[in-house]
């Protein structure tokens, strides 16, 4: 059922399928390889090397981190392919890059230059207000954001191999990321208590594909990896998201907008690895220097997360 976007089922930490793997299942498997890791935003090769040395499982190559996108305004587009290629040449870990929502040509360019994953991102300016990219048309895995279970399953049906919370990138404020992961996981807990008749009604209520709703109920989790993103700025933030049930963490402005990026990058990786060990978390949280300047999410702050559904 690969053509419909049904995902292979989780086994003991690995993909399991009774039939031959579909192209989509392969992409889901590639995304699963990043479980338990930290993905860091970088704007040049030097930052990419710092991230790799700190233990990041992948880097996100972009010209401006979300905090700068917020501060500078204007239209935020796909990064210069030359810059992305320089970052790819500087590290051995996977490299991601962002495309605007609905801008399938930006995604085609990113695939052509050899990025490992594409993030169809609400942090960039929308290219299409009504349609997301048909991600089944691509060979590489896509990452998409969500605020709730309905959004997550719609993105998976379109071909997303990884889901992340939208949060509010560039704010250094984790409250929206927490809200989004609690929304998704709370809905899944509710779903597991439903009978078959109720599942039909619930799928319609959240505007999600029925077969993916059923699969999520059976698994007790999303059928693809779920990372936290948007506002993660400290080791404690990262560990919080892991304890809430995420499979890994994206860190954007929180590292390279801080007082000591090298030390903070290593600390966040350690926090994700040891997210249930309070003694380790206390140790890695010491002496990190000044954290990035955060934003209170009031009416004056643009909500990137609301740009798409």
Curated annotation (Swiss-Prot):
D-ribose 5-phosphate binds at residues 41, 170, 231, 252-253. GO terms for biological process: pyridoxal phosphate biosynthetic process. GO terms for molecular function: protein heterodimerization activity; pyridoxal 5'-phosphate synthase (glutamine hydrolysing) activity. The keyword RNA-binding does not apply. Its EC number is 4.3.3.6. The modification N-acetylmethionine is found at residue 1. The active site is at residue 98. Keywords: Acetylation, Cytoplasm, Lyase, Pyridoxal phosphate, Schiff base. It catalyses: aldehydo-D-ribose 5-phosphate + D-glyceraldehyde 3-phosphate + L-glutamine = pyridoxal 5'-phosphate + L-glutamate + phosphate + 3 H2O + H(+). Pathway: Cofactor biosynthesis; pyridoxal 5'-phosphate biosynthesis. CDD domains: pdxS. It holds the Pfam family SOR_SNZ. It is found in: Cytoplasm. D-glyceraldehyde 3-phosphate binds at residue 182. GO terms for cellular component: chloroplast; cytosol; endoplasmic reticulum. InterPro entries: Aldolase_TIM, PdxS/SNZ, PdxS/SNZ_N, RibuloseP-bd_barrel. Vitamin B6 is an essential quencher of singlet oxygen in plants, that can protect cellular membranes from lipid peroxidation. Catalyzes the formation of pyridoxal 5'-phosphate from ribose 5-phosphate (RBP), glyceraldehyde 3-phosphate (G3P) and ammonia. The ammonia is provided by PDX2. Can also use ribulose 5-phosphate and dihydroxyacetone phosphate as substrates, resulting from enzyme-catalyzed isomerization of RBP and G3P, respectively. Also plays an indirect role in resistance to singlet oxygen-generating photosensitizers. Belongs to the PdxS/SNZ family. This is Pyridoxal 5'-phosphate synthase subunit PDX1.1. It comes from Arabidopsis thaliana (Mouse-ear cress).
